[in-house]
Swiss-Prot record:
It comes from the Bacteria. The keyword Lipid metabolism does not apply. GO terms for molecular function: rRNA binding; structural constituent of ribosome. SUPFAM superfamilies: L9 N-domain-like, Ribosomal protein L9 C-domain. NCBIfam families: L9 (TIGR00158). Pfam families: Ribosomal_L9_C, Ribosomal_L9_N. The gene is rplI. Binds to the 23S rRNA. InterPro entries: Ribosomal_bL9, Ribosomal_bL9/RNase_H1_N, Ribosomal_bL9_bac/chp, Ribosomal_bL9_C, Ribosomal_bL9_C_sf, Ribosomal_bL9_N, Ribosomal_bL9_N_sf. Keywords: Ribonucleoprotein, Ribosomal protein, RNA-binding, rRNA-binding. GO terms for biological process: translation. One of its GO terms (cellular component) is ribosome. Belongs to the bacterial ribosomal protein bL9 family. The lineage of its organism: Bacteria, Bacillati, Bacillota, Bacilli, Lactobacillales. This is Large ribosomal subunit protein bL9.
Length: 150
């Protein structure tokens, strides 16, 4: 019997797959527990429509990430942060990714989750620093952060 998996079933199939399984297994376990449904022509065409909609939605998200990347990588987009520093240019403390995210939101009205800012170590010196920001699985932008003395 052909079924469409509604969720992942270990060893049998993943969500959205159409597979042939034994009749008893399909009726007594998969369909009864809501893990799959019979693969009728209407159900298969509905699945294709869902996959198209998901692909379109994913393409829109990718396009939005690309637009945001061009805005962030613009030469005029420099995140200004003021901090107390010593005479040698080293900061008292450091600038973590949370502070960069709040400064970006205040200055440019762009809200980015602090976990998407990929700062290996907090910024501890004054001057310009290039910081990578992962906007999407396939899109990574680089923003310039300028740390000035307070």
């Amino acid at each position: 019997m052909k079924v469409i998996f509604l969720e992942d079933v270990k060893g049998k199939g993943k969500r959205g797959e159409v597979k042939n399984v034994s009749d008893g297994y399909a009726q007594n376990f998969l369909i009864k527990n809501g893990k799959a449904k019979a693969a009728t022509s209407a159900a298969v065409s509905e699945l294709k429509g869902q996959k198209k909609a998901e692909a379109k939605h994913e393409a829109e998200i990718l396009a939005d990430a690309e637009k945001l990347k061009t805005v962030l990588e613009n030469d005029k987009t420099v995140v200004e942060i003021k901090a107390k520093a010593g005479k040698d240019g080293r900061l008292f403390g450091s600038i973590p990714n949370k502070q960069i995210a709040t400064a970006l939101e205040k200055q440019y009205k762009i809200k980015i989750d602090k976990r998407k800012i990929e700062l290996s170590n907090p910024i501890r010196s004054m001057g310009y620093t290039n910081v990578p920001v992962k906007l999407h699985q396939k899109v990574t932008a680089t923003i310039r952060v300028h740390v000035a003395e307070q």
